[in-house]
């Protein structure tokens, strides 16, 4: 079996593996891309899964934080975030009350050039965009322990916000079952010890197929509880087809909409 891996921005590497060495395959299905994804986001925000329309969920004085992924993920933030900003403005929330926090986990900080490429010039000019800092305690808030003994410290900007929106992508994940949903918070905007211990605990599960591609598992349940405690109120998740084109948006309650997207 040939395995094609992305290498850099435009290249790929092909690995040939014997079929007997393939234990299982977790991949995205074939689905047609959306014809007008921007309009689909607007529709979904007007009728999110399990929630009232976004314009009814926020108040004009609210401090809103949008938590989005970094450039190691394919989520089209430059498409999604401008629509969110417009919807929040329509609800009375000015750009000055909105921040974007990039959920780096323990990844390196994105440069200004990379942020503009990922989020677009419009978003960069309209709102403050902050790289999550997993190392310095003054930028984190201790919110207690997860059930399996993991100390949880989250980004202070996120925790202190009145309304938190997570923007990510639903895809099979080896340690969480699926990426997306509350994973943008836990471990996305947690401290380095929280991130390390989360990966360590998940990596001890054997066989790997108990987690990867499984909707209901212990790690996902912890993710959901911590994300709720950190204040995640709404998710906008993409579902991409095998060509990385948007085939669906899962928008709404962080658990209900995530499950609908999976």
Where are the regions that the model predicts?
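N-terminal amphipathic/basic leader segments beginning at the initiator methionine
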Residues: 1-43
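Short glycine-rich or small-residue beta-strand-to-loop segments that form or flank ligand, phosphate
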Residues: 63-74, 99-105
């Amino acid at each position: 079996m040939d395995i094609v891996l992305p290498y850099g921005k435009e290249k790929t590497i092909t690995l040939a593996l014997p079929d007997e060495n393939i234990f299982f395959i977790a991949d995205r299905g074939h689905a047609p891309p959306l014809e007008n994804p921007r309009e689909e986001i607007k529709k979904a925000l007007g009728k999110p899964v399990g929630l009232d329309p976004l314009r009814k969920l926020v108040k004009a004085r609210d401090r809103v934080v949008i938590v989005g992924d970094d450039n190691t993920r394919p989520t089209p933030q430059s498409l999604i975030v401008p629509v969110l900003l417009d919807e929040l403005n329509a609800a009375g929330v000015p750009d000055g009350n909105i921040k974007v926090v990039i959920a780096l986990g323990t990844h390196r900080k994105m440069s200004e050039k990379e942020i503009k490429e990922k989020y677009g010039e419009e978003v960069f000019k309209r709102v403050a965009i902050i790289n999550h800092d997993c190392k310095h305690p003054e930028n984190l808030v201790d919110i207690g322990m997860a059930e399996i003994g993991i100390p949880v410290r989250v980004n202070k900007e996120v925790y202190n916000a009145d309304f938190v929106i997570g923007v990510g992508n639903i895809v099979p994940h080896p340690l969480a079952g699926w990426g997306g949903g509350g994973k943008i918070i836990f471990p996305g905007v947690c401290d380095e010890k929280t991130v390390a211990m989360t990966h360590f605990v998940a990596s001890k599960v054997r066989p790997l197929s108990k987690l990867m591609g499984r909707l209901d598992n212990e790690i996902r349940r912890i993710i959901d509880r911590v994300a709720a405690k950190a204040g995640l109120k709404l998710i906008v998740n993409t579902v991409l087809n095998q060509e990385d084109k948007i085939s669906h948006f899962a928008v709404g309650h962080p658990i209900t909409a995530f499950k609908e997207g999976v």
